[in-house]
Amino acid sequence: MKELAAELRKYKQVFVVCDRNVEGFAREVTGLRTDGRSGEPGGLLAITADEAHKTIDTVMQICRWLLEMGADREALVLAVGGGVTTDMAGFAASIYKRGIRYANVPTTLLSMVDAGIGGKTGVNLDGFKNLLGVIRQPEFTAIFPEALQTLPEKEFRSGLAEMLKTFIIKNPSHAYERTVAEGPLPELIQMAAGIKQEIVEKDEFEAGMRRKLNLGHTWGHAIEWRLPGAYSHGEAVAIGMVQAARYAERFGIAEEEGLAARIGKDLKACGLPTELPCPVSELLPAIAKDKKAQNGQIRLVLPVRIGKVVVKKVDPSTL
């Protein structure tokens, strides 16, 4: 926490936007003051950070608060919370006064290994996931593993799914197998975050290899649209990863025999769902609107073995 305090002192104004569920933690890690003293947080806004509130209205609430608080273009917005919080606070910072700086203090496993890294910010539009947003890199991301001690089990599993996704894409030192067997050890969390950061640095605007990070998300986002609130993001992505592996086998590109069965078994062992909760036909409207779609085709990220995925263009009607 001393390192974070030292980092914050570099900024003239710091405004904290946090998930109301972690307001106490946000005050603790920032040493929040309200006297406007240089280098100290100038105020805190606690928001409802769930998918139902991940909208442009909440982003406008944040922007209006920044305006009322007198935030200028030298200010820093510090997002403290999970992926919904970092997405919305980052988006607000990206458009307020044509862009001010922001940083992340992720408090969920998912945001530590995925959402809090890489600069993707945004909100949902009419229930469709992340259709509004920009890519803007945070000044820094500060990870405090102790924040996970009070994380609800459902959210813990959600982040575990994203960790496993990362290691299906790239699997150094058998990180995938270790995560299944031992859980998200701090060194594995750092490894997953490092893999994502490495990919982002090579392809910030998702023109190529960064698309691989969308493994499981084509079906996952569609499930979240079709059954809002029924599954956490990570749970929906887990189902999507099994579907992706099945399609890799169907297209004859899987290099590992029984890949889909293996991934399904491992995800189940981690307490994650693996089967579609509805017919694919009910998911097609969302799949067709997927932000990766282009010229009537979607880009599916398909695992061919643990540690390797490919991107394949397909017609949604073939799913």
Question: For each predicted feature, which ranges?
Answer:
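ATP/NTP phosphate-donor binding region
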Residues: 1-76
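Short glycine/serine/threonine-rich phosphate/pyrophosphate-binding segments
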Residues: 84-91, 112, 222
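C-terminal charged capping/lid subdomain of soluble metabolic enzymes
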Residues: 15, 161-163, 254-319
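Active-site segments that bind and position negatively charged phosphate/pyrophosphate groups
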Residues: 180-281
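A glycine/threonine-rich phosphate-anchoring loop and its flanking beta-alpha core
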Residues: 91-180
